[in-house]
Structures are given as structure tokens and as C-alpha cells.
């Protein structure tokens, strides 16, 4: 199984496998040769324009197909995306199917569609997708995620969602799932004789189905034993969704943290001076024995043009990455909050080309090991108000 992940948080249910951040031949061969029968390729296409996403998906698929010539595996290709239905759909699965067919693969005629993310309370019941909030089930189309600047949608009925996005619902299998038992049953179906064993499969899913297909066992949540050194950590918060803001406010109430706000407008107007000021402040905070919490101003700058919105997001992310690259101290751990932010920190700020997934520090929050410290990839839309604080309190000295 090869999972093409459209942002870096898709490993939030697995452990032990490889995450590769490039799709050159050597990197993909490393994934195929690994002892685990599955690996993740971080394409990060959710942060790209439609045209960029198509090109990257095609490049990654072409390399997967090329390397598999030496292995001859029946391929299960997973397009891992958002449990709140944001992302380049059906573009990515269309490109995956096209690449396989073009190289002579027999591909199962239906594309399973499984946005359920059990750990975070994202469930599909009778073809309708919900977000669990305590005892309530909220249709995802009624959440802020449905009003996303780039990937907005208007329905929680998955057949209607598929049609809204320009695809034919009859080409998909809607996977209803409220728990892992249902996902394990569907995983058994995928490998049963009902589907020809010579057929490869293309799947669109969130994070839970790949775990069910892989068959990996559960493991305990990670703890302080992952730390290589004592001292304070560092939080970099780029996501601006409501849940992140609530988590940020709670984190900043914890004794031992210190807020460092980065004004997004100043990134656009006066980035060099702002960078100098921010790095100086981080050093002062660390000298006081406090954990710096660097975050972008919470007011979203709304733009009508989708490409301009993507460009703005990239400018902000580049600034945060530069902070990580130029950190004036070595943290005991680093937390990146938000999809674009955590990806760019991983690949640019830390320069990681491949990494072993350690597991999760708290439910649905994955961790990989950088050269000198663990790096925690915290999705923007996961957890409750205390979740960032929980990570801080779990790892503080």
C-alpha cells in the first residue's frame, strides 16, 4: 500500500512505517524496500493550486509505477486527504487511476470513498458525514471547514458532495464507518475474492482506513522518553481555524509558556525587521526558562482569488519556516501546528527527506524524529481546547 498524503498529518493513526517527503527514484525505492508493507509519500498537494497538485500527483505516481516494475506488487494506492472533505477531489484520484491504466494496470472499477477519521470523531452514517462534538453529531457542511477559502462545499451527503465536486457518484463506494470494526470489515472486503486479485485499487480516504488496511497493532501513546535532551520546547502555530485559536488560548494560560505573536500584515510589509525582532524575543524567552509559543495573528486576510490566497498562505508559511531554520537555540522538542505550517517545517525548516513514524504523542497527533529532537505534527482541526496544553504538560521538564 502506498499512501499519497496531501498534507503531513495523515500519519496520525500509524507507527513504524516510513514517511518520505520526496518522490525521486531513490526515495521511492526506500519505501518499497522497507520491512513494513506500506509507506507514505508526503505530496502536500492540499497547499497547492489545482495545476500544481495535478503535476505533483502525476510525478509521484509515475515514480511509484516505475519502481514497482522491479517488484510486481498489486498496488493499493490511497489518496489520503481531509476528514472534513477539503482537498483536490476528484482530481487526485482521477490522476492516480489514469497513471495506472496508462501503464497497463488493471484497476478496480469503483473508487472507495472513506472520509471517516474515527480517532477524531469524524464518522459516516447512512452516507452522511458528521463531526462528533461531545454527544452531538454535526454535519460537516455546517462546520467552518465547509466554508474554507479554497475548498468550500455545501453538503454532508457524500453522494451529493461527489456530484458537487464534478464526479459521478456511481463511480464510488461510500464507506459508512462509526468505528474501526466497520473499517476492518471493509478492509477485508478490499482483499477478498469479490475484487479480482489482479486488480489494483485507488482509494480516497482520511487517516483511519489506511491503518485498518495495514493491519498494524495499536501501541501506547508516546511520552517524555522520546526526548533526547532536557530544556524547553518550541511551538510554531500557523493554523487560523477556530479550534486552533481555542487551543492556543488555553496553551498560553499554562505556566511556563510565553506568547510571541507574528503579525501577518507585517510579514507582507516588513518581513526582515519582523524576523530579527522575533528571533531576539525567542532568545529572551528561552533565557527566562520559558517555552516560546510563536503564532500568527488570528485575523484571516480574505482574498477573492484562490491562487492569491494560496500565495499568501505560502508567504506566511515561509516566514515561519525561516524562524525554525534560524532558531537561536536547540529545543527539546518542536511542535508545528497546522497543515501547511507543519509540512514546510518538516521539509524546509528541518530538511527531512525520510523519517520513521514514531507514533502519536496524544490521540491523532503524530511524531517523527528529526536529527536532534522529536518533531510533533499537530493538525489544525484535531483535539479539544486542552490538546496543545496536553502536549506541553506531557513533555515539559
Tell me what each language-model feature is:
Residues 86-92, 305-311, 344-351:
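Short glycine/threonine-rich loop-to-helix capping motif typified by GTGT followed
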Residues 127-281:
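Conserved, well-structured core segments that form the ligand-binding/active-site neighborhood
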Residues 12-40, 277-290, 356-372:
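N-terminal short beta-loop-beta anion/metal-coordinating cradle
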Residues 17-21, 330-332, 340-390:
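Conserved, well-ordered active-site substructure
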Residues 8-10, 81-91, 118-120, 179-182, ...:
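Gly/Ser/Thr-rich loops at beta-strand to alpha-helix junctions
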Residues 3-5, 77-80, 106-115, 169-177, ...:
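General beta-strand structural signal in soluble alpha/beta enzymes
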Residues 1, 5, 12-15, 27-29, ...:
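Cap/lid and interdomain-hinge subdomains that line or gate substrate/regulatory clefts
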Amino acid at each position: 500500500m502506498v499512501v499519497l498524503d496531501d498534507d503531513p498529518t495523515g500519519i496520525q493513526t500509524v507507527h513504524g512505517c516510513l514517511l518520505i517527503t520526496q518522490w525521486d527514484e531513490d526515495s521511492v525505492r526506500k519505501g518499497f524496500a522497507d520491512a513494513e508493507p506500506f509507506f507514505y509519500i508526503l505530496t502536500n498537494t492540499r497547499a497547492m493550486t489545482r495545476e500544481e497538485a495535478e503535476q505533483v500527483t502525476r510525478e509521484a505516481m509515475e515514480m511509484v509505477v516505475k519502481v514497482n516494475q522491479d517488484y510486481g506488487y498489486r498496488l493499493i494506492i490511497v489518496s489520503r486527504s481531509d476528514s472534513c472533505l477539503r482537498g483536490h477531489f476528484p482530481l487526485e484520484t482521477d490522476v492516480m487511476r489514469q497513471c495506472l491504466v496508462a501503464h497497463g494496470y488493471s484497476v478496480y472499477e469503483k473508487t472507495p470513498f472513506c472520509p471517516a477519521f474515527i480517532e477524531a470523531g469524524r464518522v459516516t452514517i447512512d452516507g452522511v458525514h458528521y463531526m462528533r462534538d461531545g454527544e452531538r453529531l454535526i454535519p460537516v457542511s455546517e462546520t467552518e471547514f465547509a466554508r474554507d477559502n479554497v475548498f468550500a462545499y455545501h453538503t454532508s451527503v457524500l453522494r451529493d458532495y461527489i456530484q458537487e465536486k464534478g464526479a459521478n457518484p456511481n463511480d464510488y463506494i461510500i464507506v459508512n464507518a462509526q468505528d474501526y470494526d466497520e473499517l476492518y470489515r471493509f478492509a477485508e472486503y478490499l482483499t477478498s475474492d469479490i475484487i479480482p486479485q489482479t486488480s489494483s485499487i485507488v482509494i480516497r480516504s482520511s487517516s483511519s482506513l489506511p491503518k485498518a488496511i495495514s493491519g498494524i497493532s495499536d501501541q501506547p501513546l508516546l511520552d517524555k522518553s522520546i526526548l533526547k535532551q532536557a530544556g524547553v520546547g518550541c511551538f510554531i502555530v500557523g493554523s487560523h481555524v477556530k479550534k486552533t485559536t481555542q487551543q492556543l488560548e488555553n496553551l498560553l494560560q499554562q505556566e511556563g509558556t510565553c506568547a510571541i505573536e507574528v503579525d501577518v500584515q507585517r510579514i507582507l510589509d516588513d518581513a526582515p525587521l519582523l524576523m530579527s525582532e522575533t528571533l531576539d524575543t525567542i532568545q529572551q524567552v528561552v533565557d527566562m526558562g520559558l517555552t516560546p509559543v510563536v503564532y500568527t495573528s488570528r485575523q484571516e486576510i480574505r482574498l477573492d482569488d484562490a491562487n492569491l490566497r494560496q500565495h499568501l498562505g505560502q508567504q506566511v508559511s515561509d516566514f515561519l519556516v525561516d524562524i525554525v531554520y534560524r532558531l537561536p537555540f536547540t529545543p527539546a522538542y518542536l511542535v508545528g501546528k497546522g497543515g501547511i505550517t507543519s509540512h514546510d517545517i518538516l521539509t524546509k525548516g528541518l530538511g527531512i527527506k525520510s523519517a520513521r513514524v514514531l507514533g502519536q504523542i496524544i490521540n491523532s497527533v503524530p511524531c517523527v524524529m528529526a536529527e536532534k529532537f522529536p518533531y510533533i505534527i499537530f493538525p489544525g482541526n484535531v483535539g479539544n481546547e486542552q490538546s496543545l496544553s496536553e502536549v506541553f504538560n506531557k513533555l515539559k521538564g
